[in-house]
Amino acid sequence: HRFESFEEAGFTICSPKKKEWEEASLQVFELLNRLYQNFPIYRSISSQQFSRIFQKYQHILDFSMVKLAYKEGKLAGFLIAMPDYGSLVYQKLTPLNLAKLFWTKRFPKRYMIMYLGVDEEFLGLGSALAYPIFKEAQKRQASAIGALIHQKTVTRHYAAELQGDKHEYGLFELDL
């Protein structure tokens, strides 16, 4: 599989520890900034703004479902999946909701693939990053959802043998 071929090619694919998240998230920021800058609705933010946003993620992330790929010590790609908390993260933090958050983090039914980015130089690395996520979700008897993947992109094939259902969505705009 592609995962092994990238490891054989000298890539290190790992999950960061919680204490490494601040540094790792800044590396993700740099790569994300470069990769997404040509997206139509992209808006640049500072690394400080990004850190404030992503620092909060450390409390709800299952770091085993975050994959970082390094080539010669430089971040080449990342995949961030998290348990599907639904609207729970937006609700008031009562003791009951806090217990539900911890339960969902520990025993999720579904994982959401939130962010995926790969340096253009390393095409195919995204599939290598997705593979252990889908395998781990399968082992935990959970599903993994890659949200809003465009049909004409290569990402629709990631971990194809592990994919189950596929749903099609339309995105429409109405000028008023």
Tell what function each PLM region has.
Residues 7-8, 107, 166:
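A short, polar/charged loop/turn motif at coil->beta-strand junctions and beta-hairpin connectors
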Residues 40, 121-123:
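A generic structural signal for short coil/turn motifs at secondary-structure boundaries
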Residues 1, 64-67, 71, 77-102, ...:
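Active-site/acyl-donor-binding loops of N-acyltransferases
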Residues 14-116:
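A conserved beta-strand-loop-helix scaffold within acyl/acetyltransferase catalytic domains
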